[in-house]
């Protein structure tokens, strides 16, 4: 195990390389650490445990699920909530769907799955066990949202979204200085549409602002460089499920 630390002005990248020779084949896992307001980067194999998760409780491959992306992201807070839920349940919990990138689609236009803050689980459980798991997820008070059974009767959806949303049930407003996984969604969408310069690091800097303003101006939106309700609505509707492009940062 090799740990390499890179320190920048406002954030820290932590790169963990388990197999240096195979790093190009590894999955890049970006984690937003709410405690330090940093983005951490890990290079892991699909069989490795997710960062901050209890050893062996959920692998990178399980969290990646049906996504084909070589880069995925989540938050420390979600993984800590998962640890508590798993501990309270006392036995393995199947997770079939967690992460997707916006251009891959598969969920609603402003789904928390694209932010890496949502998990769909317990698909193979009995209805009674799913009901019990929902109750536990509510009682631990860690998840921001636990979907009621009448909406997802054959699985349990939990998420740890950030609030308040710019639009009802949507994403938070992000602007220059923001650091979180919603910035990653924004950067990913802009890159995919050809508005490059933002990178894919979860840090809303000058490059992200310039790319966003160019997008807003091209779509007849107020070019204020802020991703609010109107911009999120246009951008997510346009990119969701369109597939990657030559300018997508994978």
What do these predicted regions represent?
Residues 3, 8-9, 60, 197, ...:
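N-terminal compositionally biased, intrinsically disordered segments and leader/signal-like regions
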């Amino acid at each position: 195990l090799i740990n390499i630390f890179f320190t920048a002005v406002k954030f820290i990248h932590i790169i963990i390389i388990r197999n240096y020779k195979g790093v190009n084949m590894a999955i890049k896992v970006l984690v937003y650490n709410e405690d330090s307001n940093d983005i951490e980067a890990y290079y892991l194999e699909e069989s490795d445990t997710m960062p901050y998760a209890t050893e062996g409780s959920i692998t990178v491959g399980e969290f990646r699920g049906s996504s084909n992306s070589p880069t995925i992201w989540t938050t420390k807070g979600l993984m800590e909530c998962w640890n508590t839920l798993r501990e309270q349940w006392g036995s393995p919990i199947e997770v079939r769907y967690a992460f997707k990138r916006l251009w891959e689609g598969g969920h609603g236009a402003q789904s928390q799955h694209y932010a890496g803050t949502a998990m769909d689980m317990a698909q193979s459980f009995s209805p009674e066990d799913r009901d019990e798991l929902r109750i536990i997820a509510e009682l631990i008070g860690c998840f921001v949202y636990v979907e009621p059974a009448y909406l997802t009767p054959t699985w349990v959806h939990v998420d740890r979204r950030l609030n308040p949303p710019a639009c009802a049930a949507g994403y938070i407003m992000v602007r220059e200085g923001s650091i979180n996984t919603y910035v990653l969604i924004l950067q990913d969408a802009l890159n995919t549409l050809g508005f490059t310069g933002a990178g894919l690091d979860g840090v809303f800097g000058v490059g992200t602002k310039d790319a966003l303003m160019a997008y807003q101006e091209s779509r007849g939106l107020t070019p204020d460089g802020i991703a609010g309700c109107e911009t999120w609505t246009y951008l997510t509707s346009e990119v969701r499920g369109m597939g990657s492009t030559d300018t997508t940062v994978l």
